[in-house]
Amino acid sequence: MTDTHSIAQPFEAEVSPANNRQLTVSYASRYPDYSRIPAITLKGQWLETAGFATGTAVDVKVMEGCIVLTAQPPAAEESELMQSLRQVCKLSARKQKQVQEFIGVISSKTPR
């Protein structure tokens, strides 16, 4: 007798046959010896429909006989203050000290 948890339930596949693509591994030439290296090119409007718009960061997982591409969510935009802080970090130590002193002056509660 089978357990109720071992009975297969019908389900719809996440990927329909209409969404399958057939590709062939081609090659690209590598300079300076022009050796051939394997290459796969993906292009088409279906990429954007699948969540891979131009500029999307992609995570690539490689296994034997399998490559999985996952679109990464867009990074949250930095606030204007954080962008300014990153700019200050690139300044010289003397200028960073001046910025710190300026912040100290404008944040002090004592009137002048």
Curated annotation (Swiss-Prot):
Q: Which GO terms describe its biological process?
A: RNA metabolic process
The EC number(s) given in the record are 3.1.-.-
Recite the UniProt keywords alphabetically: Cytoplasm, DNA-binding, Endonuclease, Hydrolase, Nuclease, RNA-binding
Q: Which domain of life is it from?
A: Bacteria
Which terms in the Gene Ontology molecular function aspect does this entry carry?
Answer: DNA binding; RNA binding; RNA endonuclease activity
List where in the cell it is found: Cytoplasm
InterPro entries reported in the protein's UniProt record:
SpoVT-AbrB_dom, Toxin_SymE-like, TypeI_TA_SymE
Any one annotated GO CC term: cytoplasm
Q: Which PROSITE patterns match?
A: SPOVT_ABRB
User: Which part of the chain is the SpoVT-AbrB domain?
Assistant: 29-74
NCBIfam families the UniProt entry points to: PRK13605.1
**Function text:** Involved in the degradation and recycling of damaged RNA. It is itself a target for degradation by the ATP-dependent protease Lon.
Q: Tell me its family.
A: Belongs to the SymE family.
Q: What is the protein's name according to its record?
A: Endoribonuclease SymE
Gene name of the record: symE
